[in-house]
Amino acid sequence: VDNEGPRSTIAKPKGAPIGLEENCLNYARLAPCLAFALALAACSGSSTDASNTAASPGAAGSAAPGGKTIGVSIQDREAQFYQDMEAGMQAEAKKNGYTLIVVDANRDNAKQQSQVEDFISKKVDAIVLTPFDSNAIGSAIVEANSANIPVFTADIANGSSQGKVVSHIASDNVQGGYQAGTLMCAAVGNSGSVAILDQPEVTSVQDRVKGFKQALAKICPAVKVVADPDSGGKRDKANSDMGDILQANKDLKGVFGINDDSALGAVTAIKAAGLSGKVMVVGYDAGPEARAAIASGAMYGDAIQYPAQIGAQTIDAIRDTFAGKTPPAKIATKTGTFTQADAKK
């Protein structure tokens, strides 16, 4: 940005070539000085325009220029997790001078594919996807590849064999699932039957369930999974599915919800059945509402994700790509656990 203000006439040392200003004075009788003023304005005007449209400074240490546009298709912008992730992206994009075009796929694969096509027509500089259907998103990624637009996935990976993704940024969901399983073992006293409110078409959930089952097998092998319906990660569906599970499994001791909405849906069903405190609920994400439920005792605990960090690191990977660097193919962010003891701190 040009902070020097208006250009001023600079005195010339003796012997310097005659400049435009002096020519104007020498030939004042032949041509009005207005010609000089217009010429000078034209010259300085192009410099000012270039200065005003220059890329915004990047984050500290960034070599990448700003002024880039990134298309982001999020599978469900109503989910608290994705709102936090988007906030992390926006904050980091602002530091780097990037513009984000963020759209909601509304849990619709066809809509998400159309959004990618729209990004391509807009000639965005990079695309970020949180695929609704990991196994069906590949064809859209292929289209972006053909347009030479780099593609990144955040939270949920491309589960198909089609398409090239530069980098996948997500929690270590196997580790997070293992931590959730550890909580469940403690919650049910290392024995009994439990359920999983699943979403099997999503790669990150596949990893969570994998880690959860690994923990049960290692820490509390007497605990058995007796039901694992596809609740789609939605609260109302989880509530309905949990009611059915409770009817069919009178001795159920616990349930693992693969995200906070699933867990909170289970809490509602358990309360309606008069089983609060008898069927333990472990969730995943640890958003504000889930933390409040844990603090009140309605839930036993949660595996923690840090969605804002996922969002920020996604933009960092894109920045490195713009700068000609090669980011890691997989970037894992940390996970943790949150229990009632943590709520009291």
Residue ranges of model-derived segments:
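A residue-level marker of the well-folded mature domains of exported/periplasmic proteins
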Residues: 41-345
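Sec-dependent bacterial lipoprotein signal peptides
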Residues: 6-41
